[in-house]
Amino acid sequence: MKVAVIYFGGQYNHLIVKDLKYLGLEAVAITPDKSVEELKEFDSVVFGGGPYSVINELDKMGFAPDYVKSLNVPKLGICLGHQLIAKVLGGEVRKANKPEYGLTTVNIVDEDTILRGLKPSIKAWESHNDEVVRPPSGFRILASSENAKVQAMVNNDNSIFGVQFHPEVKHTEKGIEVFKNFIKICRK
């Protein structure tokens, strides 16, 4: 399976590629200046983190909004990628009332799909100033934390996922399980 990992300049993006390769996938780092057509060869897309804000810097994210809307493959957004998916598909993203940095308790409210095996909670690495406050229509919330209601979300057909935390960072408990679960879903 070939996975495009969209790089937005986040400090942990290389770890996403490393984890996916460790799990036996062909993971390729892609900058968002490639056209949608150039990504048609991929079986899934993972949107990594980065320094931008989808609130007022969507224009700095190249063709990434088009990837969200136009590529008909399973997608996983991590941190900024999670916020990007929410914003582009009609959810609401705002400056966080209380930004999260470091280890945070993430409470799993629905462990179906990408969070299978992680209930009741995990300690997860966070690094964000913005947050999804309302998922797009047709999405449900999978996890929350004390300061962020939408720590994880999925669409109704279980093909588009977002997580606010960083499963690729070693400090996140069972982070690799998020990727394993995503791969299982992609292979269905």
UniProtKB/Swiss-Prot annotation:
The keyword Amino-acid biosynthesis does not apply. It holds the Pfam family GATase. Its EC number is 6.3.5.2. The active site is at 79 (nucleophile), 166, 168. It is an enzyme of class 6 (ligase). It comes from the Archaea. Heterodimer composed of a glutamine amidotransferase subunit (A) and a GMP-binding subunit (B). Catalyzes the synthesis of GMP from XMP. This is GMP synthase [glutamine-hydrolyzing] subunit A. It comes from Sulfolobus acidocaldarius (strain ATCC 33909 / DSM 639 / JCM 8929 / NBRC 15157 / NCIMB 11770).
